[in-house]
Amino acid sequence: MHITSRTLLFVLAGALSACAGSPPPVESAPPPPPPAPTQAPPAAAPAAQPEAATPPKADPEAEKKQAELAKLAEDMKAMEAKADKEAARFDDALKAEVKALIAANYPSAGAALRAALKGKHRTPGNADRDAARHPVENLEFFGLKQTSTVIELGAGEGWYTELLAPVLAKKGKLIITAFDPNGPADSRNTLYGKRVKRMIEKSPELFGKVDVVVIDRDSPKLGIEGKADLVIAIREAHGWHRNGKFDAYVAEAFKALKPGGVFGIVAHRAKPDANPDESAKQGYLPEAWVIQKVESAGFKLGGKSEINANPKDTKDYPEGVWTLPPNFRLGDKDRAHYAAIGESDRMTLKFVKPAR
């Protein structure tokens, strides 16, 4: 068979076409890898909390002051309540008794004092201390007369004032010192001043002729010269020294007295070798020291009495002299023991202002 070139080309083209067929399948692309697991973002650190403010440190002095003010307010309230009750006690019958006590005639100051000791005008409870305080013996030793002009330095709660007032009302004169009742509200001295004021006001019949001289504790001035026959300071001297005013008070007493006048001191007696700066904090002073100080102001020692001595007083208590009766500062702790000791051992000194 004759194969032409055209035929050959045709055959070759068919063969090529058959060989080509359908194109080979295209391999599918591998699936994409799974996404990487999402990591949770790290937890944010908690916001810093502001530091709590540190409370200010307690100021011991401020706390002490607050406690003192609270106690002062409590004591002021108690004082006013007691004064109200005492004023109410002075009814018409008691006022009449006071007038009769003052009007009566007595042969001596001692007799007048003994009559006053029995009076119902005395603050309830005060008579309980007569045996320990010896008021008649003290005042007779100091030379009290019914005609005397007497200055009482520091009336306190009026223990001596209510005895002296009726004795001197008719022929003599009683002058007492007190702190300002209108002083600063945060001062305990103001309480003391108010207490004296309330005492004087409760009975014009008893205290109407008593003069009150208001003094400044830090600068005591009586404003009296050469008029007094007797100046007394009963259980006051330790406080004078503790406040650095011992010399000032003694100088005022000297100035106020007539020549020949008497300065009478009753004070808690320390051990002979005691340091007065330290013993005064406990309420006591050495007797020799007191004598030396008073004589250095111009006085002469006119006599000593042991009427107020108490050998049971050991003078070494936790709360000083205030551990003993009548204060009993420890309350019920060892109360029977301190009651058995009794009131303090006291010096009783009579000084005389020399005549010109």
Where are these regions (language model features)?
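Bacterial signal peptide processing site
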Residues: A20-P23
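Class I SAM-dependent methyltransferase Rossmann-like catalytic core
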Residues: S108-F141, K145
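A short acidic, Gly/Pro-enriched loop at the edge of an enzyme's catalytic core
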Residues: V210, K221-V231
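Conserved class I S-adenosyl-L-methionine
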Residues: K145-G156
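A short glycine-rich, Lys/Arg-flanked "PGG" loop and its adjoining helix->strand segment in the class I
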Residues: A165-P166, F246-P259
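A short, conserved alpha-helix within the catalytic core of class I
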Residues: R217, G239-E252
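C-terminal motif of bacterial Sec signal peptides marking the signal peptidase cleavage site
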Residues: A15-A18
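Conserved beta-strand signature within the Rossmann-like core of class I S-adenosyl-L-methionine
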Residues: L174-A178, G260-R269
